[in-house]
Swiss-Prot record:
Belongs to the universal ribosomal protein uS8 family. Disulfide bonds: none annotated. Part of the 30S ribosomal subunit. Contacts proteins S5 and S12. InterPro entries: Ribosomal_uS8, Ribosomal_uS8_CS, Ribosomal_uS8_sf. It holds the Pfam family Ribosomal_S8. PANTHER family: 40S RIBOSOMAL PROTEIN S15A. It comes from Ehrlichia canis (strain Jake). Gene3D superfamilies: 3.30.1370.30, 3.30.1490.10. GO terms for molecular function: rRNA binding; structural constituent of ribosome. The gene is rpsH. Keywords: Ribonucleoprotein, Ribosomal protein, RNA-binding, rRNA-binding. This is Small ribosomal subunit protein uS8. One of the primary rRNA binding proteins, it binds directly to 16S rRNA central domain where it helps coordinate assembly of the platform of the 30S subunit.
Amino acid sequence: MSLSDPIANFLTSIRNGQLSMNKVIVVSYSYVIHAILQILLSEGYIDGFTEKSKSSSIKFFEVKLKYYNGAPVISQIARISKPGKRCYCSAKDMPKFYNGLGLYIISTSKGIMSDYNARKAGVGGEILCGVF
């Protein structure tokens, strides 16, 4: 099965896993997904993730989802820039997600980072997704 948008598939897996109260979900491997998972871990939205492999060529991530008092920590996670309509912004025009309570994950020339770090570094880029 070919995926036209693996990032959207990854975000949907997280959303569905949290709605069904799963402790662990399995998502496909890519460098972009790895970078997004590192940001989600550093910001406290997930408990952790590990890289696994079925064979030498098939890799995937096991993601430990985080809950607080029985409720999912991630209340909203959405794809912003889509394959059919890309969304770019400069560092000075970068919006804040829920007035700074949430975060945007941005693909910049210096790598994938949160909106706060992109503003701090003075770089803009493609807004991949928003997390609240």
